[in-house]
Amino acid sequence: ITLDPDVQTMDVDLRNNTTKMDYKVTFDWPGMRYNPRDKIVYKWLPSLYYNDRDGYAPGIRIDRSYGEWEKKMYWINYALNKDPLKNKNNFYWSYLNVFKPIHSMQNTSFKLWGFSQPGLQEIGGEIEKKWSKTYRKSPYHVNKAGFYIQPKVDTLRTNLYDPGKLAVVYLKHKIYNNYIDFDSEVSSSVEPYSDWSFNRVT
């Protein structure tokens, strides 16, 4: 039995239907905003890194998305020069996953990320909640809670960071409308996973 074959009703999430989801593979053109409701979209884009130690590092980025509810990004690069300290070629990667529940926890999103890039590594997670005191009327509020961990810094490939590991938890709040845009943040290091100790309010 096929119900609503022309997709006339407001079923905002077709992923849980018995009919198998279709998909579309396309090049990630600049400014592209292709978000169909009845397809999983895969967008790809070639990538190229360069630094003095790794030389060129060709790769590819692949984005997987379903409307505004699910977004994943996979990014990989392979260095053509061997690392003299490891005697092998370095493999660099990035991963991002953003998920919004549809049938519960309205206006809430979950984000997970991780990367190993020339000079820096990081993993992290975040929960975001958007709300307003009067439904869909300003001022709007955005609350975020999250963490990130940077286990080490390779100072041979970047001079933007001091050596050492870093672990941080944070809370963020934003309130905005057409006339104001106010951001605040409370963050703190996490011992013993951080070589720095601090508490910060901005």
Q: What are the functions of these language-model segments?
A:
Residues 120:
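Extracellular interaction modules
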Residues 46, 74-78, 110-114, 142-151, ...:
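Membrane-embedded beta-strand positions of outer-membrane beta-barrel proteins
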Residues 4-105, 124-139, 144, 155-178:
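Outer-membrane beta-barrel initiation region
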Residues 111, 176-202:
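Extended beta-strand-rich architecture
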Residues 94, 115-117:
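Compositionally biased, intrinsically disordered low-complexity regions enriched
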